[in-house]
Amino acid sequence: MTKRYFVTGTDTEVGKTVASCALLQAATQLGYQTVGYKPVASGSEMTTDGLRNSDALALQRNSSLPQPYSAINPYTFAEPTSPHIVSADEGRAIDAAVLSRGLRTLEAQADWVLTEGAGGWFTPLSATLTFADWVQTEQLPVILVVGVKLGCINHAMLTALAVEQAGLPLVGWIANDIQPPGARHGEYLATLRRVIPAPLLGEIPWLGVSPSQAATGQYLDLSPLERA
């Protein structure tokens, strides 16, 4: 049976992709056939191969099961803004059925599929649909990425509560050091451990400006997911 997870974050720019790559690496090391899925991405660049998103490319690189880019990232937008805004501007609506079909295709091939969201938990995909709505429909277990910085405790508690209210299991969380640790870093982590109702899968240290290129799977322990 395919293991499937959804990665969300406490905010945008908290390192969801860094954590997702680490998860894919760690699952591959456990012997799984892994694939990462970034169904909606904005902030993409035109290349000789067409419009490409750096986060989706990172997931593609870190998947053990080779996939064409279109399978990893069905909706790609150039402007780095909320998906519902840019999709409306371009007249290209985001269809939840397309997201689900893409997920089914990957699930039929891999036994460990990781879907990465965009922005935070309630990121709008249209005037009537949020990413949270789609995740709830798919009944995906959730992994929360916390970018460790001032304000992250409140954001983590709010997101964990929203996941719980959606009736979805929060199966783990990852502390991602998105800046050099400050004087209160240890206290932030201790508080997060206490208030997030899920096991800590690991802490990814501050790695500088290109963390998605690093071997980050070593920082995670997926045994709580194996037991779930």
UniProtKB/Swiss-Prot annotation:
Mg(2+) binds at T17, D55, E116. Keywords: ATP-binding, Biotin biosynthesis, Cytoplasm, Ligase, Magnesium, Metal-binding, Nucleotide-binding. It is found in: Cytoplasm. One of its GO terms (biological process) is biotin biosynthetic process. It catalyses: (7R,8S)-7,8-diammoniononanoate + CO2 + ATP = (4R,5S)-dethiobiotin + ADP + phosphate + 3 H(+). Catalyzes a mechanistically unusual reaction, the ATP-dependent insertion of CO2 between the N7 and N8 nitrogen atoms of 7,8-diaminopelargonic acid (DAPA, also called 7,8-diammoniononanoate) to form a ureido ring. This is ATP-dependent dethiobiotin synthetase BioD 1. The lineage of its organism: Bacteria, Pseudomonadati, Pseudomonadota, Gammaproteobacteria, Enterobacterales. The gene is bioD1.
